[in-house]
From Swiss-Prot:
PTM (free text): Predicted to be exported by the Tat system. The position of the signal peptide cleavage has not been experimentally proven.
Entry's transmembrane regions: none
Protein name: Glycosyl hydrolase family 109 protein
Keywords assigned by UniProt, alphabetized: Glycosidase, Hydrolase, NAD, Signal
Required co-factors: NAD(+)
Binding-site residues, substrate: 219, 238, 250-253, 332
Enzyme Commission no: 3.2.1.-
Enzyme class: hydrolase
Cysteine disulfide links: none
Family of the protein in this entry: Belongs to the Gfo/Idh/MocA family. Glycosyl hydrolase 109 subfamily.
Pfam families: GFO_IDH_MocA, Glyco_hydro_109_C
Presence of keyword NAD: yes
Length: 459
């Protein structure tokens, strides 16, 4: 957990064995046994739909944090800053990390949380507590689904860092368990709460872009130094994924906002994906330039193509482009593009062109549309913390929905849908970029209107 939870190489334990065996059987990481592009079956429901289901109201939202490394430790003070939130328990396999987290809570003037660090399964004891309403999971990816499932089975709502799951089977299990236990499972996608993304979303819903046709999202972030750091990702777990799978390993930052623009699972749905990857070159080159002879990294073979590009089509015929590259030198970007019949928005840097306001092929100033900022940004944001304030806005809104007894903005169907390109892109790349169908995690309810990220201000 320390450094996002101190786990050993995920491919030395469960993940590589599972995914490699599946691929060898012609199933791929997505667990698909059907032919290219064949429709995926809808699984029988284990309970009633969780769409639009409200939280029970909480006077205080009591949070248990699993994983207090880089991400978890950075989010801890933001939870404490949100009105009506208390941290009652923290867990990590590193006792030092747990003690630091507990001290941060008490230093902020709050009671000391219960501490769990007795091995990699001690999170189960945290989840059995009766003073935890919401479990926050900030651990290596292979633990997201098991921990979320345990949380729900122990009666806790759960929020998971990206992605919610790494296989289609995992995602279906999250959906099934949420429906069966009546507990919410939320992909904590902070980028959905970024100021620009929320402003564009308001403009879409006010009709400024006309008919929405195309969107693009990405995770383009030079992580080479961090991936090879001996301390940042404890156990160097994140680089290990590049030795096992070739696809878009971090789709939700780009897809979550674009899915909101297109009302995915609220009138439209993702139907199929086609993905392709470049050669894997960047990490090997970085290793050659920076790692000494004899370093254990020289035993690694990187199979994850540096750039993975995916095209997704929706039921309404719209197209989404996703991109992922963490292995090459470049400025940070999530692309965040939207094209409609009335104009276009492109981010990094933010610029806009809308008829009839703009003309002569000259970009307009996006700041001129500040009146369309979401009410969360007008009245709450940016708040403390990094990432431009979107982390705090996300946690504020989460706690608000739990305290007032409202439905969450992001439900288990969104969480599964946004995370699915992880597995589906790997399968498409393995099949020489053949189309692979998206499961309908909503079981046919994707046209049902229900609350989303563009939430109205509570009365």
């Amino acid at each position: 957990m320390a450094g996002d939870e101190s786990r050993s190489n995920p491919f030395s334990r469960r993940t590589l064995l599972r995914t490699s065996a599946a691929a060898g059987a012609g199933l791929g990481v997505a667990g698909l046994s059907t032919g290219y592009g064949a429709a995926q079956p809808v699984r029988p429901a284990k309970g009633e739909s969780m769409m639009g289901v409200a939280f029970e109201a909480h006077e205080t939202v009591r949070v248990g944090i699993i994983g207090v490394g880089n991400r978890g430790a950075s989010m801890l003070p933001l939870f404490l800053a949100v009105p009506g939130v208390a941290i009652t328990a923290v867990c990590d396999v590193s006792a030092d990390a747990v003690n630091r987290a507990a001290r941060a809570v008490t230093d902020a003037g709050h009671p000391e949380p219960a501490k769990y660090s007795a091995g990699e399964d001690d999170f189960e004891n945290l989840l059995r507590r009766d003073d935890v309403d919401f479990a926050y999971v900030a651990t290596p990816w292979e633990w997201h689904t098991p921990m979320a499932l345990s949380a729900m089975r122990n009666g806790k709502h759960v929020g998971v860092e990206c992605p919610a799951g790494t296989t289609v089977d995992e995602l279906w299990e999250l959906v099934d368990t949420s429906e069966k236990t009546r507990r919410h499972c939320i992909q904590l996608e902070n980028c959905s709460y970024s100021q620009n993304e929320m402003r564009v979303l308001r403009m879409v819903h006010d009709g400024l872009f006309g008919q929405v046709l195309f969107g693009a999202g990405a995770y383009l972030h030079d992580l080479r130094e961090l991936l090879f750091s001996k301390t940042y990702y404890a156990g160097q777990w994140r680089r290990a994924w590049h030795t096992g799978l070739n696809g878009d390993l971090y789709p939700t930052h780009g897809l979550g906002p674009v899915a909101a623009y297109m009302d995915i699972n609220r009138g439209d749905r993702l139907v199929r994906i086609t993905s392709m990857s470049t050669p894997a070159a960047g990490l090997a080159q970085y290793r050659e330039q920076h790692m000494p002879a004899g370093d254990p990294t020289w035993n690694e073979r990187y199979v994850k193509g540096d750039a993975t590009i995916s095209l997704i089509q929706t039921e309404a015929g719209r197209v989404v482009q996703l991109a992922h590259d963490v292995s090459n030198p470049r400025p940070y970007s999530r692309l965040n593009q939207l094209q409609g019949t009335n104009g276009v928005f492109e981010d990094y840097p933010a610029r806009i062109y809308l008829e009839p306001t703009h003309s002569n092929d000259e970009w307009g100033d996006f700041a001129e549309f500040a009146d369309y900022d979401h009410w969360l940004w007008k009245e709450v944001g940016p708040g403390p913390g990094g990432h431009g304030g979107m982390d705090y806005i996300m946690l504020y809104r989460l706690a608000q929905t739990m305290r007032l007894g409202l439905p969450p903005d992001i439900d288990v169907y969104d969480s599964a849908t946004w995370s699915a390109p992880f597995a589906l892109s790997v399968e498409s790349v393995r099949r020489n970029s053949a189309p692979v169908d998206f499961p309908d995690f909503t079981r046919g309810r994707w046209q049902t209107p229900h609350p989303g990220v563009d939430s109205p201000k509570p009365a």
